[in-house]
Structures are given as structure tokens and as C-alpha cells.
Regions:
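Terminal accessory carbohydrate-recognition/targeting modules of carbohydrate-active enzymes
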Residues: 2-303, 307, 334, 341, ...
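Aromatic-rich carbohydrate-recognition surfaces in CAZymes
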Residues: 173-174, 195-198, 270-272, 337, ...
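Solvent-exposed loop and edge beta-strand segments that line ligand/cofactor-binding
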Residues: 154, 261-267, 326-344, 380-393, ...
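Active-site-adjacent bridging/hinge elements
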Residues: 146, 244-252, 313-327, 366-376, ...
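Generic, well-ordered alpha-helical scaffold segments in large soluble proteins
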Residues: 314-318, 349-353, 363-370, 426, ...
Length: 526
């Protein structure tokens, strides 16, 4: 069974990642479907909620915004939403503005709702998953529904450099007059919180042009603009959808039910072959440009035709550029921001090995600025966590080592090696707040487990579950590697004798400290 890592498909398929039931992996379709589309799911899989609700997709942009839900459009996490954006003036977490968009097909007065929602009492309503015939991802997510004689296609694009989602509906086939109704469900909340019906929410809806509306439930949030490009009318029929249930949160032990508000719906007639575009963003747009913008975004996507292309696309999802001179690798979607250690671990794969060396320079330059400020005890930007963690500088050296092994003559070589020397000197001078250098050359981590001092940072009542301290195996393995790499890069004749002496002591000390009688390595030694 083939699998694809859950790193957005940025997460970067442009990235779309398939997340498994444990948030790790998801099976790919049977081999007989790969010639048609590498990532394709049929009615059998999608109509079975036990299966389809385990399959999620994430799409992000360069600004840290994303959309994320299950393949059938049913939100199962409090983090799920169609337009999730950073609003740093409110809180450091992302915020969900548009939770979902429920489509309804109307023929001969009969309504067929294509949405799917779970409720706290176990109810599933509507049951739109029963109408899905196919879901595939080539350059973008595409869902095909069949309702009687109606065949409707839904495609979505999350814009690359804007906080904007565009959803295209195309009537592929119909034997009679067809009406399409689009009902948005809005949240206006932090991704880690849940909302409930209240009297504080401002449920006013304002018209935008002739085919759009804007709304903002709470003070401090930006207006959410929702527009369509077709001749349509907006129906002010707002109400709270109560007791929506997120089973993934229940499994995680968190509150799992909330109320969300739907302000009304758009309604329009569709003819065979006709398309309508729905867009949601933070400002008014010219709806006549939506078809061209949609096509342009699709043209810049790379098709997911095999595992490698999926992973390359996924890597791009994590590239985060909040400002022109600040470049990062996000630690993960949907809940993590920028974490220094994770960034340095992931940087080689997200740049060097995905054929984007320029990304390495951009991210490493930002990281080096932050690291030097940390060494100088200058206040650090709030958008990067964990710069003081004990092995962050060593992972950065490892990333530089891998980069220079691929690009040995790069113009940045001298700049990077100067930084490597500066980090090594920082550790040797005992200025790191957690680590100290021992006479045997090993690094020793101080700490009581409050807070945790390593990447194993789970806590109960403020205490580390695994209170690692002392000689840490990965820290000292990276430390030995850093020194040896620096000696090789500088050349033995230019290598300081002091560092050569540390290497001579460190090698034997590592073996004596960490290798146990059975040939395994101790995790840490106090």
C-alpha cells in the first residue's frame, strides 16, 4: 500500500496533503486508477463516512493562511475551514472566517443538499456525501456530484499570494431547469477555540456590488467579503447551526461541539456547461476577473502525478513569507507556527532536495539574523519559537552541511561557514542558557524538567512527561558532527587547535557515555 506523508498537498500542492486517521498518512488509490489520476477516490470510499472522514486535504498560501477539511467537505476538527487566516493583532494563532460552503441543487422544487455536517447527538445532516461520484486531485481538488439527472462539478483554488478562496461550480449535465444555492457558514474565531450562539455577534449583512455581501461577527475582525460572478440574488436568512460536532477533538480530549452562524444564501439558475465562481476574501474584488484569476492559479500549479511530485508540492506548502525580508518554514498545519528546531530539520528537504536552493538562502538568512540577535540577547521576533532550544544551532549547521555538499561552490559558502564558526564558539564559551561544555568535550543540558529543555516537550501540570537532561544523545551526536564538518570545510591547516582538541576528546567520550553493553545508545545520561 502506497502512502503519502501528511504535509499538505501545504500542508505544498501546490500542495495538498492527505492526512490519515492519526494525522500521519493516507493510503493512495488502487494502482488501476493511477493512470487516470494519481490521487483519486471513488464513490465506494467517499460514501463511507468511516473511511472518508479520515481523509483530509490542506492547502496553504505564502502568507500562512490555509483551508482544510475532509474530502467530503465535512469538518471534523476545530481547525477545519475554507478560509483560515493569521490575524496577529488579535492572537498568534490563525483564525477561521469561512467555515464551510454548503451547495444545494434544486430541481422541480426538490432540494438536494450537498453539504455534510456532524452533530453532537450523532446525527449526520445533510448527507451530501451520498451524491459524490468522484474526488480527485491533479492540480486542484475536484469533486463530482450526481443528483438524479444532474451532474455538478466543484473545484476549489486557494490563492497563492492572497487570503482568498475561489470555488467554481460547473453544471456538467442536466435534463431540466436547475437552481444552485450556496450557503456560507462563518466562524470568526481562533482555531483553538470554539464558539456558541450569543448576543454579541453582529449578524448584519451588507451588500457588496450587485452579487456579493460582507459580514463581520465580532469587533476586531476584518470584514469577510463573499461574492459570486453570476446573476444571482442574496437571501437574508440567517440562523445559528447548533451543536456541530468535531470527533477528532473529542478523541484528543478537547471540547468538541460548537454553534456556527450562517448569514443567508446566494441563489442562481444554471444551464448545461455553465460555471459560477464563488469567492471569499478580506476585500471586495472585481467578480469579472474571477474566471481568469482561477485559470491563472491553476496554470501555476504542478500536477500531482507520482509520489515525488506530491511531496515536492507538499514541501512548498510550508514556505511562509510574512514580509519581503522574512522567510520561514512552518512547523506544520493546522496547529503549528514557526518553530526554530523544526524549521532547521525540515529546511534541506523543503529547499535543497525539492530543487529550490533559493529558498534555502532566504530561510537561512532570516534564521541567522534571529540567531545572532539571540546570541547578542536582542529581543527576538514573536513569529519564531524555540530559538533558545539546545540543539537549534546544531541543526542549522547540519542544514548548511547538506547544502554545501550539494552546492560546494555556492557564493554564500563563506557567509555560512562564518556563521558555523560563530555558533561553535557560542557553545564553547558556555553562553548558552541551557548547555555547558564539559572537560570531556560533551555538551551537558541543565534543567529540572520545568519547563522541558528538549523537543520531547509534553507536560502534565507543568512538569515534563520525560524530563530529559544531562548528556543528550542527539545533541552530542550533532555537536560532534558540527565540529568535524567545520574542520573538513575549513581544512586541517586552518582549523583551530582548540577545536581539534575538543574533537579528540569528544569521540571517545561519546562512546563511553552513550553506548550500552548491548550496542544501543542511551537516550540521555545524567
Amino acid at each position: 500500500e502506497r502512502v503519502i506523508l501528511s504535509t499538505t498537498c501545504h500542508v505544498t500542492t501546490e500542495p495538498l496533503a492527505l492526512v490519515g486517521s492519526r494525522g500521519v498518512v493516507a493510503p493512495l488509490p488502487p494502482s488501476n486508477l493511477l493512470s487516470m489520476s494519481y490521487l483519486k477516490f471513488d464513490r465506494t470510499t467517499l460514501s463511507n463516512l468511516d473511511r472518508s472522514l479520515q481523509l483530509e486535504h490542506i492547502r496553504s498560501n505564502r502568507g500562512g493562511a490555509f483551508n482544510c477539511t475532509t474530502l467530503v467537505g465535512c469538518n471534523t476538527r476545530k481547525y477545519h475551514g475554507l478560509l483560515v487566516v493569521p490575524l496577529p493583532h488579535l492572537r498568534r494563532h490563525n483564525h477561521i472566517l469561512l467555515s464551510s460552503l454548503d451547495a444545494t441543487v434544486i430541481q422541480h422544487g426538490a432540494e438536494f443538499n450537498l453539504g455534510v455536517h456532524l452533530y453532537g447527538d450523532g446525527t449526520v445532516y445533510p448527507n451530501g456525501h451520498k451524491y459524490i461520484r468522484e474526488y480527485n486531485i491533479d492540480k486542484m481538488p475536484r469533486t463530482i456530484y450526481r443528483v438524479g439527472g444532474v451532474v455538478l462539478q466543484r473545484e476549489s483554488i486557494f490563492c497563492h499570494y492572497k487570503n482568498q478562496v475561489i470555488i467554481k461550480f460547473t453544471l456538467l449535465d442536466s435534463h431540466s431547469e436547475t437552481t444552485l444555492r450556496l450557503r456560507p457558514v462563518v466562524a470568526f474565531r481562533d482555531v483553538i477555540l470554539l464558539s456558541h450562539e450569543n448576543d454579541t455577534a453582529d449578524t448584519t449583512v451588507h451588500p457588496v456590488g450587485t452579487t456579493g455581501v460582507r459580514t463581520c461577527l465580532y469587533e476586531g475582525y476584518p470584514d469577510l467579503y463573499m461574492q459570486v460572478d453570476a446573476s444571482s440574488h442574496w437571501v437574508d436568512e440567517g440562523y445559528w447551526i447548533k451543536n456541530l460536532h468535531y470527533p477528532k477533538e473529542q478523541i484528543r480530549g478537547y471540547e468538541s461541539c460548537e454553534d456556527l452562524y450562517s448569514p443567508g444564501y446566494f441563489e442562481m439558475d444554471l444551464r448545461n456547461g455553465e460555471s459560477v465562481y464563488f469567492t471569499a476574501q478580506l476585500e471586495e474584488v472585481d467578480v469579472t476577473t474571477l474566471p481568469a484569476l482561477f485559470d491563472s492559479e491553476v496554470a501555476h500549479r504542478k500536477a500531482r502525478v507520482d509520489l515525488r511530485s506530491c511531496l515536492r508540492n507538499a514541501c512548498s506548502q510550508f514556505y511562509y513569507k510574512p514580509e519581503s525580508n522574512r522567510h520561514y518554514i512552518l512547523a506544520g498545519f493546522p496547529w503549528y507556527g514557526v518553530r526554530a528546531r523544526d524549521e532547521m530539520v525540515a529546511l534541506p528537504g523543503c529547499s535543497i532536495y525539492s530543487d529550490h536552493p533559493e529558498r534555502f538562502h532566504n530561510v537561512m538568512s532570516t534564521f541567522i539574523r534571529s540567531s545572532i540577535n539571540f546570541i547578542k540577547q536582542i529581543e527576538l521576533p514573536l513569529d519564531m519559537e524555540g530559538v533558545r532550544d539546545p540543539d537549534v544551532g546544531l541543526w542549522a549547521i547540519r542544514a548548511i552541511q547538506l547544502f554545501l555538499s550539494e552546492y560546494p561552490d555556492d557564493s554564500h559558502r563563506s557567509f555560512y561557514l562564518d556563521f558555523v564558526g560563530r555558533i561553535i564558539d557560542y557553545y564553547l564559551s558556555d553562553r548558552h542558557p541551557i548547555l555547558r561544555i564539559e572537560p570531556n568535550g560533551l555538551l551537558y543540558a541543565e534543567g529540572s524538567g520545568t519547563p522541558p529543555v528538549t523537543w520531547m516537550d509534553s507536560t502534565i501540570a507543568g512538569q515534563a512527561v520525560v524530563p530529559r537532561r544531562g548528556y543528550l544523545v542527539e545533541v552530542n551526536g550533532l555537536w560532534y558532527n558540527a565540529l568535524c564538518f567545520y574542520r573538513e570545510a575549513r581544512g586541517a591547516e586552518n582549523f583551530p587547535e582548540e577545536l581539534a582538541s575538543v574533537i579528540e576528546r569528544l569521540g571517545p567520550a561519546f562512546e563511553q557515555t552513550f553506548v550500552n553493553p548491548y550496542g544501543y545508545l542511551y537516550d540521555y545520561v545524567t
